[in-house]
């Protein structure tokens, strides 16, 4: 299921970031950072009534030759292209400007639903000054005050009315939904073509469940797969290549619809910060993951070359220590068959359930080997553990005091559960909950 995307667009200094922070609230502050994940704040999750959505903050668009204006405008165009609904923000204090009218022209061309928000209406008297904005042609303007939080409810009511009904998933539960993600030029398109051209792969293109996405169904060794949004992976264009922050929104949609993610890195260039950022999206969505080192044919090899590279991957992607690593050459079609067992294993483990009785035996043994921590004379007591979800496997551990469950001990319990049950290829979530 994909969450709708809402983009906040407008000229500089109309209060876009303030509204963004108001909508996402505490979600922007990270309670427990995952080590090694680079966080990118241009998008976050929002929630209104029963609706979950992703919301994007964009740079200010204006007329003239301001620094970076060409890039900012290009980024905004990508955000508009990927958005399902657009909040067009203007500022009542400065009135209607030429830059507002230029942004309006961009939005007309997009043919997307637009909700017009007039910000900085900080007192009732200022409501009389919003009428000029009707001339923009987007219907009723919504008066809001980002600094005081006024009018946001009415604005969000108008936004969620434009959300479309989620289309039913057309694929069987047994079909593995697969996405290939990575920064530009690591060989994603080549890998798509190589997989679909592999012996014993039977291919058929189908319309995806999201706008302008094309999925590709194929089967290999009696397992059905669907490669999510192959058109998006093959989508070219300098705007998308040069606006990585915003073009990643397309990858987000594909990630949300997938069970298993192939994260592609370039063996020639090694691992850079952007690789970790892209991987962080998939990890935070709780997806099963396989790391694919592409262009392996270009690397000069000695006896331990693969081991050294694998050690480097483990060091840089510490938060993906559960993911298997495959070394391939999409261009030369080398070692592709090593991928399929990893994908299948990751998918099966992503859906794995364990019996509560066996789970509690493992937890009891873990505590006997490494007693629970204490803080100011109080010891953590673990009463019971149970699995509450799959995709990813999620466990609740009932304790006497949640504050006593340190991150390090939670990590220890996860490692013991992994040692007992496997779970290669999938994240495992452990939630501490106070026993009533």
From Swiss-Prot:
Binding positions for GTP 1 per the UniProt entry = 10-17, 57-61, 119-122
Q: Where does GTP 2 bind?
A: 182-189, 229-233, 294-297
Where is each EngA-type G domain found? 4-167, 176-351
- What are the KH-like domain coordinates in residue numbering? 352-436
Q: GO annotations under biological process?
A: ribosome biogenesis
What are the alphabetically sorted keywords of the record?
A: GTP-binding, Nucleotide-binding, Repeat, Ribosome biogenesis
What range does the record give for the signal peptide? none
- UniProt-listed InterPro entries: G_ENGA, GTP-bd, GTPase_Der, KH_dom-like, KH_dom-like_a/b, P-loop_NTPase, Small_GTP-bd
Q: Which GO terms describe its molecular function?
A: GTP binding; ribosome binding
What family classification does the UniProt entry report for this protein? Belongs to the TRAFAC class TrmE-Era-EngA-EngB-Septin-like GTPase superfamily. EngA (Der) GTPase family.
**What assembly does the database describe for this protein?**
Associates with the 50S ribosomal subunit.
Family matches, as HAMAP family: GTPase_Der
What PANTHER family does UniProt report for this protein, alphabetically?
GTPASE DER (PTHR43834:SF6)
Q: What does this protein do?
A: GTPase that plays an essential role in the late steps of ribosome biogenesis.
Instruction: Supply the name of the protein.
Output: GTPase Der
| Lineage of the organism | Bacteria, Bacillati, Bacillota, Bacilli, Bacillales
């Amino acid at each position: 299921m994909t969450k709708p995307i809402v983009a906040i667009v407008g000229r500089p200094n109309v209060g876009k970031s303030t509204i963004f922070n108001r909508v996402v609230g505490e979600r922007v502050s990270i309670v427990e950072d995952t080590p090694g994940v680079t966080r990118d704040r241009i998008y976050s999750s929002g929630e209104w009534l029963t609706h979950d959505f992703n919301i994007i903050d964009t740079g200010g668009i204006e007329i003239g030759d301001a620094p970076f204006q060409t890039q900012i405008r290009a980024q905004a165009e990508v955000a508009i292209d990927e958005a399902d609904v657009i909040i067009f923000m203007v500022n009542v204090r400065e009135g209607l400007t030429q830059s507002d009218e230029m942004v309006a022209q961009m939005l007309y061309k997009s043919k997307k639903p637009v909700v017009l928000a007039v910000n900085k209406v900080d007192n009732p008297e200022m409501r009389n000054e919003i009428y000029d904005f009707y001339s923009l042609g987007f219907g009723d303007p919504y008066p809001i005050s980002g600094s005081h939080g006024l009018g946001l409810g009415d604005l969000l009511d108008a936004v969620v009315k434009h959300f479309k009904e989620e289309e039913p998933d057309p694929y069987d539960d047994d079909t593995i939904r697969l996405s290939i993600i990575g920064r530009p030029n690591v060989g994603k398109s080549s890998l798509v073509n190589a997989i679909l051209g592999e012996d014993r792969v039977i291919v058929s293109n189908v319309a995806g469940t999201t706008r302008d996405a094309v999925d590709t169904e194929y089967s290999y060794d009696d397992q059905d797969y669907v490669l999510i949004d192959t058109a998006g992976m093959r989508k070219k264009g300098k705007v998308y290549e040069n606006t990585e922050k915003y073009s990643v929104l397309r990858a987000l949609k594909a990630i949300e619809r997938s069970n298993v993610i192939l994260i592609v890195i370039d063996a020639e260039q090694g691992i850079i910060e952007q690789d970790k950022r892209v991987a962080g999206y998939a990890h935070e969505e709780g997806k099963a993951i396989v790391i694919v080192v592409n262009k392996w044919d270009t690397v000069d090899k000695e006896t331990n070359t693969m081991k050294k590279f694998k050690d480097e991957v483990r060091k840089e992607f510490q938060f993906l220590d559960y993911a298997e690593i495959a070394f391939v050459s999409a261009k030369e079609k080398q070692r592709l068959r090593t991928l399929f067992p990893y994908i299948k294993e990751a998918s099966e483990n992503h859906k794995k359930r364990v019996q509560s009785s066996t789970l509690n035996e493992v937890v009891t043994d873990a505590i006997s080997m490494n007693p629970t921590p204490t803080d100011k004379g109080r010891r953590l007591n673990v009463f019971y553990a149970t699995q509450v979800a799959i995709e990813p496997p999620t466990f609740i551990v009932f304790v006497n005091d949640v504050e006593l469950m340190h991150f390090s001990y939670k990590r220890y319990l996860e490692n013991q559960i992994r040692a007992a049950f496997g779970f290669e290829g999938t994240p495992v979530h452990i939630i501490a909950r106070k026993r009533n």
